[in-house]
Amino acid sequence: MRSQLSLMGKKEGMIHVFDKDGNLVACSVISMSPNVVSQIKVDSTDGYNAIQMGADEISVPEKTLQKRVNKPILGHFKKSGSRVFRTLKEVRVSEDAVNEASLGSEFGLEVFEDVSSVDISGVSKGKGFQGVMKKFGFRGGPKTHGSGFHRHAGSIGMRSTPGRCFPGSKRPSHMGAVNVTIKNLEVIKIDLEKKVLLVKGAIPGPRGSVVVVRRSSRAKA
């Protein structure tokens, strides 16, 4: 079952470490507290097999919890009999994996102990509304005196035929804040004691954002 799991962690930032060959490598640091099974879905009642995982438990008194969490979410956790978490993630698994799972089971970094590379998903940094030069790398117009065309997109249509602009062209719009997956990132180090995972290179999102880590779909056999 462990090979099918995706676990949630928190991006802490980036550091440099030396690899086994003495090369300086830029790494992303992901802290990963245990993910807890908060709900089990089976094909007979839900139409598919899945496990819902919860991370980042909300540890506050019951009276405070009633104020911070809305009733539908509280009812969901009460029905499953699990603790209350800030983040939930559903993972599709096989029927055998569902039969093995039990409410309250915890999964941590030990899931990736035998893994050399992982896929990481997260929400990229939001850049707000941006023009075509920043978002798509357009060259822009002349930088000289007299030019009224510096950072514009330029022509986006043709002539009287077709007499319209085709949809999907590159235009100024919101940049960032989208789901991004980076595949086959090398695992540099797993620290089970500190619950920290180091992967080579950058990962999506700002510091403190939630990322989802899974075994790489492109890993060599």
Swiss-Prot record:
Q: What is this protein's record name?
A: Large ribosomal subunit protein uL3
Using the record for this protein, list the coiled-coil segments as residue ranges, or answer none: none
Q: How does it assemble?
A: Part of the 50S ribosomal subunit. Forms a cluster with proteins L14 and L19.
Matches recorded under Pfam families:
Ribosomal_L3 (PF00297)
Q: What does this protein do?
A: One of the primary rRNA binding proteins, it binds directly near the 3'-end of the 23S rRNA, where it nucleates assembly of the 50S subunit.
Quote a single Gene Ontology cellular component term: cytosolic large ribosomal subunit
- Give the family this protein belongs to, as stated in its UniProt record: Belongs to the universal ribosomal protein uL3 family.
Q: Which UniProt keywords apply?
A: Ribonucleoprotein, Ribosomal protein, RNA-binding, rRNA-binding
Lineage top rank: taxon: Bacteria
Tell me which Gene Ontology terms the entry assigns under biological process: translation
One Gene Ontology MF term: structural constituent of ribosome
